[in-house]
Amino acid sequence: MKDVNLLKTNGVDVDKALELFGDMEIYNETFQDYLNGIDEKKSNLAKFKNLANWADYAIFAHSIKSDARYLGFTKVAEVCLKHEMAGKEQNQHFIETDYDHLLKTVDGMTDIVKRYLAGEQAGSNTKTPTQDSDIPKPAVSTPTINIPKESVIIIADDSPLIGNFAARILEPTYKVVLTQDGKQTIDLIEAGRYNVETLLLDLNMPNVGGFEVLEYLKSKNIQVPTSIITGEDSKDMINKAFTYNIVDMLVKPFSKDELLRVVEKTKNYNL
């Protein structure tokens, strides 16, 4: 049995997280999504740091920041935000000198998540071993682009945590397909296997980003009702995005109610 007090005593803002997720069941499932993706994100962070590719470094710092905000780890999110901004500003000195602090902070979050999922109780002096078999499997796999369905909603976001959270909310009503970068999204649309009712498009993705997808849709004159997903500190990107034919935007971290509102508005929008 999971003890939410373990999270609270470690500074996790559970109440704020539940405002986004709506209930404990979805919140708990999302912890596993975080664990599924964090090692790859850290690996990419290290890779782009070593390559001095600060733009992509900022993208992965942003992705970990978003996960931390959703899960209620506000202090972790603050550290990640500093690295995201340093990447955008190409502030190599800050990144190099604070990088170990970033890793220690993120690893601390990961440790708390593993202990919580393994059922450790608050105040326990003994950590419960976190075997893979002890941790519940995710309810939604990513990506799910090979599942045929006539009408779908595409959620394009490089974070499995955010994609799976949105899918869990929407799938009782809609068929959801998850993609993790712009190339997957373009390939899926080009394949023509689905009637895409709505596209929720993260602007800040590695490899092929959201703006490349918007440019592709515009150049091919493909009419897909599209709303963007972006960070609250991306005003320039938002202004640029609204030069394209988009319906609305979701600002991370968005709640269940905000997601449902934007999906309904986008789905019913007449292009």
Model segments located where?
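Alpha4 helix (beta4-alpha4-beta5 surface) of REC/receiver domains from two-component response regulators
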Residues: 212, 219, 233-248, 261
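Two-component system phosphorelay core
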Residues: 1-151, 267
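Short amphipathic alpha-helix used as the core "switch/output" element in two-component signaling
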Residues: 187, 211-223
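Acidic catalytic/metal-coordinating carboxylates
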Residues: 180-184, 208-212
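Active-site beta3 strand of CheY-like receiver
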Residues: 193-200
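Receiver (REC) domain active-site loop signature in two-component systems and cognate sites
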Residues: 205
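Two-component/phosphorelay signaling modules centered on CheY-like receiver
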Residues: 36, 160-178, 219, 244
